[in-house]
């Protein structure tokens, strides 16, 4: 053993990776047995040290990194900045979401990276740190959620929620964060269970495909292999690909063979091949193995658990299936739309090496936007950059299609990102639609960058040509569905309050095409420091006044009004009971509408019963006379009595029982006496017959029908009798006579003799005396209006009336209603109370007022009939004022010029309801205002009437009223009424001009002009309704102006002007004055001398290619779809991840996009296909190459999914699965059909042998089968039936007469035979038998001489007596070929 001094001592932390490397080196040098003892000692040592250290995990050990606070604060500031830019209209919704997601993603990742260094510095023995860093329990991501931040979550649809969880589990989550956390719990209990079950089923399918593949041969003799190169692979990945594989072709370096064929590759040879940078290495692979139903030792390579070539008889198929399926539980299950977390097509960032100024040629770049909405330059071709500092010059070359993030001649700092270079191979993307919804109600406007013509006919979809803004101007849309209304005021009229704005016309005409009125009432807000928002108030008033009309008023003089408990009654001496008044709150009556009701007590009943009509006649009238039933609280119609007569009421007792029939003491169709106990708490009040009827679930209706039972003798007449009313004095059954009205009801029990029940009936008569119209004959002089008295019956014939809560029921009501004939043009009547004092007594009367239209003009011709008069005059002269819109605020009418379909829209501009923005607060020396170069030189004709022109020696007399400086100047000016440019400055440059001539120019404030004024005309309206013309001047005599206004000397002599356009759309916080910039976004609708008024608006940025869902000038409601943005999203790594992706590949399901890079693919195809053109075998070879390339691509795609999740799987396992997926071919219809049926699936190796044996080849084409379908198309029908579709597989095998040769593992297990793998393999059995024979033979030879001879000739004797491995394989080969011949003969 070596001395301890010479041993190498590794002083480093042994984490999970280091332990893996140590175990690998131990196995490579000492083997598994020795390594096991070493690992047992390490385990014991670890437990001992953990016990001595008393390591435990407590909640106090969860320490948050101190950098978290400022990291989150920095991210929040960046998020607020993005929100501001979005409000300014600089970013659209997708760019804002990308910025937000990437900011919080970077913050979370940086905090995760800071976690371990923080633990290492502050508390290296922290249990959480040791647990996660060593890999004993928990990953870095899990610990990050405990002590860092939870981060971004996804919603149930897979979209990233833009509200990150800033807290961790140690700090505790808020309610909102907890709900979001529940949404984004990707590895919850449900997901884990589903993922485990999916991975288990995937493993079962994989094992089902390859369960029969066993190593049964050393070398299959193939000359093919797969090519691996060292160009695009990383060193570690390429080394893992090489170790454990066997070389298929000799590898030469400078004509010297460094690795022969059939040599396995170890770690030393792999490192040597990587160091020498060997371009192409051909490796033997299960994909190219020539064996049919098994695999050879050299094509498989090493056993990963032993580090040597695989042993004979090893079931490598099952190992491969379990190796791929078991890590499925570690893969993600769901699909996530990250929305731009990964940059994707950006390969690298270019950073500056030092501080300096950057220079480049601007002709080779053009402006564009980054994916975050930032301005950038796109390179046409290769762009040369020069970075200059004082002592250094650095040159850079930026490739085309790259983004340049800096300006020319800009100062850049060291390590600053100045460019983003795109990757050569662009990742797969998909176009996604993002719907933007309006969060403001108002009117839509856009610029000329939108195609105003709709994309389709009769559509409101408009395409955005270039990046532009869509504006929603705030407002509330008020639409009138009635007829055309008249707007009384014109544009720019001032209105006071309260005043009518509109009136609605009701035209008596037959015109069909009537337009509608749309009132567009804008919501403006008063923006103050305390941010109080006041909405404008507009009210709708119902007016009953009609122009040029006559009123008809009359009073019910004989009736006094009395009030009892909030009810009003009409009392009269001749009435036994008062009239109850029924009037609406607004006091309006329509024609034939009831206004008073009389309930006669003689028509009230106290008992339940049935109503029967006699000889009266009733009529169901309109719904205006519906009344509320006091019993059921439901509205029901009244029945007007049109002919006097009588009706009858038949009393009975009715009880509703909610108990079962067992609790009822009496039986059905039995006669009981008064006072009989019905239930435990109900007794009957009268004698009568009991009738019980079921009404619902456990509900019964019990009736007691009062009367006398009579059994008639003449039974033959019973069937002809019906239930009828018998008048008094008539004999019943020729035996007795009734004195009162009687009701005969026949009862026919099922088991007893029929009988008749003689029931009493109460008669009610209605005569003309009930109609008290004489009492209301009040309008004898005026025949136009009358009050009608109508009797109403409240129940219909044969209706059952039930008493509830012992309340009496009214049967008849007498109602009063107002009636006028249609020839009089009355529409409504107003009812009011009139209080009159007579002899110190106050009496209240009822007054009814009617309004008649009198604006008809009669024509002179007497021959015109009434019908013609109505038709002609009603169409042209009649208008009734129905609705008015009244304004409660003072303001100005402004009519919108955009008219659609004849609809009217107008705005009321009120100074108290708008944003009033003052231009400046105070005067200082540093007033700076921007200039407008387009302002033309103007001339002033006269300053004012009060401005007096004096001689040189005299002073100028100026009135303070007209020329007070500051905010008092031109205080009386009103709103402007134009839509063109207007120029203002901090001081007043507005002047009122009256049309008088200029007397002298010597001492005028304005110098002489050179050009005439080219500005448009402006008008101001003052309070005296005087219109003044406005002209703008720029050249001013400063000396005279300073003399007039001393404060003017504070300013510079050069005054700059700033242009503000009336109607201009301004973004939030636009700069007008340096004293205030916190303005909301909106449209300037009015400009005064000291302030301007802004209509609030919201801009939405939209990029080219997006679509707008409404027309220009239309009204948008809050929440309506406004814009559809089109943006690109990564598809390959984002949309389908983990287990679904693996399952999609293994099941050979088609995908939407191409799975390889087309650009490089076509170049490779062009190079490979040149040698096949004109070759008879060209199609065959190209098909073979494409199939081989498809196999390699499928292996790479599956491997990428596992590598992206951090799972390492050897390629040979995946290659075994793919080999079985591509081992079948499908026969074609061309050629021979007597051997195989067209469309039949057969093995590829079997097809090749058949084509060599037959004269005419069988045409076929390769096919890629999924693992499920491949499992159902094997040589063993027992294996197929045990997997899926047992009945179908067995029936199909029976019809075909299939024979199972039991070559696989599964069919032997099912039948209880020896498994042909491991010790059950034929090769292994023969070798074991051979060893036993050797031992027996050697034991018999014990003589010394014989042993010496045997030692000398041991090789020859052994060779001659016992078979070698080659002999065993030859014998097996002959037996296998014999089995194949038997299969073929069958």
Swiss-Prot record:
**Molecular-function annotations in GO:** DNA binding; DNA-directed RNA polymerase activity; zinc ion binding
Tell me where in or outside the cell this protein is found: Plastid, Chloroplast
Give the cofactor note text.
Binds 1 Zn(2+) ion per subunit.
| EC id | 2.7.7.6
| EC primary class | transferase
| Binding annotation for Zn(2+) | 220, 289, 296, 299
Gene3D superfamilies attached to this UniProt entry: 1.10.132.30, 1.10.150.390, 1.10.1790.20, RNA polymerase Rpb1, domain 3
Q: What cellular component GO annotations does this protein have?
A: chloroplast; DNA-directed RNA polymerase complex; mitochondrion
* GO biological process, alphabetically ordered: DNA-templated transcription
Q: What are the names of the required cofactors? A: Zn(2+)
Which reaction(s) does its UniProt entry say it catalyses?
Answer: RNA(n) + a ribonucleoside 5'-triphosphate = RNA(n+1) + diphosphate
Keywords assigned by UniProt, alphabetized? Chloroplast, DNA-directed RNA polymerase, Metal-binding, Nucleotidyltransferase, Plastid, Transcription, Transferase, Zinc
Annotated coiled-coil segments of the chain? none
Q: What is its main location?
A: plastid
State if Ribosomal protein is listed as a keyword: no
Fill in the subunit field for this protein: In plastids the minimal PEP RNA polymerase catalytic core is composed of four subunits: alpha, beta, beta', and beta''. When a (nuclear-encoded) sigma factor is associated with the core the holoenzyme is formed, which can initiate transcription.
Functionally, this protein is described as follows: DNA-dependent RNA polymerase catalyzes the transcription of DNA into RNA using the four ribonucleoside triphosphates as substrates.
Can you tell me which family this protein belongs to?
Belongs to the RNA polymerase beta' chain family. RpoC2 subfamily.
Name of the featured protein? DNA-directed RNA polymerase subunit beta''
Source organism per UniProt: Marchantia polymorpha (Common liverwort)
């Amino acid at each position: 053993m070596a001395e301890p001094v010479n041993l190498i001592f590794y002083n480093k932390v042994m984490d999970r990776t280091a332990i893996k490397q140590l175990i690998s080196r131990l196995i490579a040098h000492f083997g598994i047995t020795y390594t096991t003892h070493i690992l047992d000692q390490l385990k014991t040592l670890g437990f001992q040290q953990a016990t001595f250290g008393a390591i435990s995990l407590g909640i106090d050990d969860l320490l948050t990194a101190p950098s978290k606070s400022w990291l989150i604060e920095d991210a929040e500031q960046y998020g607020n900045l993005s929100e501001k830019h979005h409000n300014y209209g600089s970013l659209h919704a997708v760019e804002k979401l990308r910025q937000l997601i990437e900011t919080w993603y970077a913050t979370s990742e940086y905090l995760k990276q800071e976690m371990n260094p923080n633990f290492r510095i502050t508390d290296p023995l922290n249990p959480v740190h040791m647990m996660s860093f060593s890999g004993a329990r928990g990953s870095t991501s899990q610990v990050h959620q405990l002590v860092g931040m939870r981060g971004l979550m996804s919603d149930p649809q897979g979209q990233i929620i833009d509200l990150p969880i800033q807290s961790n589990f140690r700090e505790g989550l808020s309610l909102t964060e907890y709900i979001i956390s529940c949404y984004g719990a990707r590895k919850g209990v449900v997901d884990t269970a589903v993922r485990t079950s999916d991975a288990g089923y995937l493993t079962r399918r994989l094992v089902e495909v390859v369960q029969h593949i066993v190593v049964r041969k050393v070398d299959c003799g193939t000359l093919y292999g797969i090519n691996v190169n060292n160009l695009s692979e990383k060193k570690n990945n390429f080394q893992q690909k090489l170790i454990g594989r066997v070389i298929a072709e000799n590898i030469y370096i400078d004509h010297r063979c460094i690795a022969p064929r059939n040599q396995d590759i170890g770690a030393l040879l792999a490192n040597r091949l990587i160091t020498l940078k060997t371009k192409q290495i051909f490796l033997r692979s299960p994909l190219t193995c020539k064996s049919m139903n098994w695999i050879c030792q050299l094509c498989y390579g090493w056993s990963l658990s032993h580090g040597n070539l695989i042993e004979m008889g090893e079931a490598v198929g099952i190992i491969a299936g379990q190796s791929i399926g078991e890590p499925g539980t570690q893969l993600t299950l769901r699909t996530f739309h990250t929305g731009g977390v990964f940059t994707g097509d950006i390969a690298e960032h270019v950073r500056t090496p030092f501080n300096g100024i950057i220079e480049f040629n601007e002709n080779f770049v053009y402006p564009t936007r980054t994916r975050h909405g930032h301005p950038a330059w796109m390179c046409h071709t290769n762009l040369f950059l020069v970075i200059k500092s004082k002592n250094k010059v650095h040159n850079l070359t930026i490739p085309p299609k790259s983004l340049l993030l800096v300006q020319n001649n800009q100062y850049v700092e060291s390590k600053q990102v100045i460019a983003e270079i795109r990757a050569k191979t662009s990742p797969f993307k998909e176009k996604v639609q993002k719907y933007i919804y309006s969060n403001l109600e108002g009117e839509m406007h856009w610029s000329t960058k939108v195609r105003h013509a709709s994309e389709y006919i009769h559509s409101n979809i408009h395409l955005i040509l270039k990046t532009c803004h869509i504006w929603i101007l705030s407002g509330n849309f008020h639409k009138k569905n009635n007829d055309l209304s008249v707007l009384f005021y014109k544009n720019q009229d001032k209105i006071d309050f309260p005043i009518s704005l509109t009136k609605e016309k009701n035209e008596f005409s037959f015109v069909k095409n009537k337009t509608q009125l749309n009132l567009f009432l804008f919501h403006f807000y008063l923006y103050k420091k305390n941010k109080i928002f006041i909405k404008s108030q507009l009210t709708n008033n119902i007016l009953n006044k009609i122009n040029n009309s006559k009123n008809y008023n009359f009073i019910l003089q004989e009736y006094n009004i009395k009030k009892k408990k909030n009810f009003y009654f009409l009392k009269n001496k001749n009435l036994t009971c008062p009239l109850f008044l029924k009037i609406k709150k607004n006091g309006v009556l329509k024609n034939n509408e009831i206004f008073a009701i009389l309930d006669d007590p003689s028509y009230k009943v106290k008992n339940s019963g049935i109503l029967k009509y006699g000889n009266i006649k009733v009529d169901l009238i309109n719904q205006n006379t519906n009344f509320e039933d006091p019993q059921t609280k439901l509205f029901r119609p009244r029945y007007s009595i049109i002919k006097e007569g009588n009706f009858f009421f038949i009393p009975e007792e009715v009880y509703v029982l909610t108990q079962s029939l067992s609790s009822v003491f009496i039986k059905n169709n039995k006669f009981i006496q008064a006072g009989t106990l019905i239930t435990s708490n109900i007794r009957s009040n009268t004698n009568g017959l009991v009738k019980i009827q079921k009404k619902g679930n456990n509900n019964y209706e019990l009736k007691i029908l009062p009367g006398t039972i009579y059994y008639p003798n003449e039974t033959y007449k019973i069937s002809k009798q019906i239930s009828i009313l018998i008048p008094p004095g008539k004999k019943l059954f020729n035996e007795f006579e009734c004195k009162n009205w009687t009701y005969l009801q026949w009862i026919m029990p099922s088991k007893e003799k029929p009988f008749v029940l003689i029931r009493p009936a109460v008669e009610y008569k209605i005569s003309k005396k009930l109609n008290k119209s004489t009492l209301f004959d009040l309008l004898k002089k005026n025949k136009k209006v009358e009050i009608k008295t109508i009797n109403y019956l409240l129940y219909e014939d044969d209706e059952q009336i039930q008493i509830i809560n012992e309340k009496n029921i009214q049967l008849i009501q007498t109602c009063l209603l107002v009636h006028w004939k249609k020839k009089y043009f009355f529409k409504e009547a107003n009812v009011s109370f009139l209080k009159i004092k007579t002899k110190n007594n106050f009496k209240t009367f009822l007054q009814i007022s009617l309004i008649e239209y009198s604006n008809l003009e009669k024509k002179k011709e007497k021959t015109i009939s009434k019908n013609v008069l109505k038709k002609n005059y009603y169409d042209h002269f009649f208008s009734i004022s129905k609705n008015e819109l009244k304004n409660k605020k003072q303001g100005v009418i402004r009519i919108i010029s955009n008219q659609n379909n004849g609809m009217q829209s107008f705005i009321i501009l009120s100074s108290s309801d708008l944003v009033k923005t003052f231009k400046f607060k105070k005067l200082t020396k540093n007033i700076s205002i921007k200039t407008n170069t387009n302002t033309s030189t103007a001339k002033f004709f006269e300053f004012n009437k009060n401005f007096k022109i004096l001689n040189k020696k005299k002073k100028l007399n100026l009135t303070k009223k007209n020329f007070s400086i500051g905010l008092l100047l031109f205080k009386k000016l009103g709103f402007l009424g134009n839509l063109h440019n207007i120029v203002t400055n901090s001081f007043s440059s507005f002047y009122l001009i009256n049309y008088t001539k200029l007397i002298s120019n010597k001492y005028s404030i304005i110098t002489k002009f050179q050009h005439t004024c080219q500005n448009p005309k402006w008008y101001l309206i003052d309070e005296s309704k005087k219109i003044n013309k406005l002209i703008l001047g720029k050249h001013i005599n400063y000396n005279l102006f300073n003399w007039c206004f001393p404060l003017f000397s504070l300013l510079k002599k050069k005054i700059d002007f700033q242009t503000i356009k009336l109607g201009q759309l301004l973004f939030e916080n636009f700069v007008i004055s340096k004293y205030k910039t916190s303005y909301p976004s909106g449209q300037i609708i009015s400009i005064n001398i000291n302030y301007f008024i802004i209509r609030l608006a919201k801009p939405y940025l939209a990029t080219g290619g997006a679509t707008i869902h409404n027309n220009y000038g239309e009204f948008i409601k809050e929440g309506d779809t406004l814009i559809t943005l089109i943006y690109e999203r990564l598809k390959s790594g984002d949309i389908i991840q983990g287990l679904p992706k693996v399952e999609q590949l293994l099941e050979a399901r088609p995908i939407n996009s191409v799975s390889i890079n087309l650009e490089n693919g076509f170049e490779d195809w062009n190079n490979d296909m040149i040698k096949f053109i004109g070759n008879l075998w060209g199609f065959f070879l190209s098909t073979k190459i494409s199939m081989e390339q498809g196999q390699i691509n499928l292996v790479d795609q599956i491997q990428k999914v596992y590598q992206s999740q951090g799972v390492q799987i050897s390629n040979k396992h995946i290659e075994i699965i793919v080999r079985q997926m591509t081992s079948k071919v499908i026969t074609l219809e061309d050629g021979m059909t007597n051997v195989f049926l067209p469309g039949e699936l057969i093995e590829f190796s079997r097809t090749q042998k058949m084509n060599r044996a037959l004269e005419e080849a069988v045409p076929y084409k390769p096919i890629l089968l999924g693992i499920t379908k491949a499992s159902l198309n094997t040589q063993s029908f027992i294996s197929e039936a045990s997997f899926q579709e047992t009945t179908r597989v067995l029936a199909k095998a029976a019809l075909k007469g299939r024979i199972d040769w039991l070559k696989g593992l599964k069919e032997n297990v099912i039948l209880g035979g020896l498994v042909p793998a491991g010790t059950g393999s034929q090769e292994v059995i023969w070798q074991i038998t051979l060893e036993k024979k050797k031992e027996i033979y050697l034991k018999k030879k014990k003589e010394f001489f014989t042993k010496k001879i045997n030692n000398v000739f041991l090789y020859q004797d052994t060779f001659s007596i016992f078979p070698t491995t080659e002999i065993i394989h030859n014998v097996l080969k002959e037996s296998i070929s014999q089995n194949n011949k038997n299969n073929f003969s069958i």
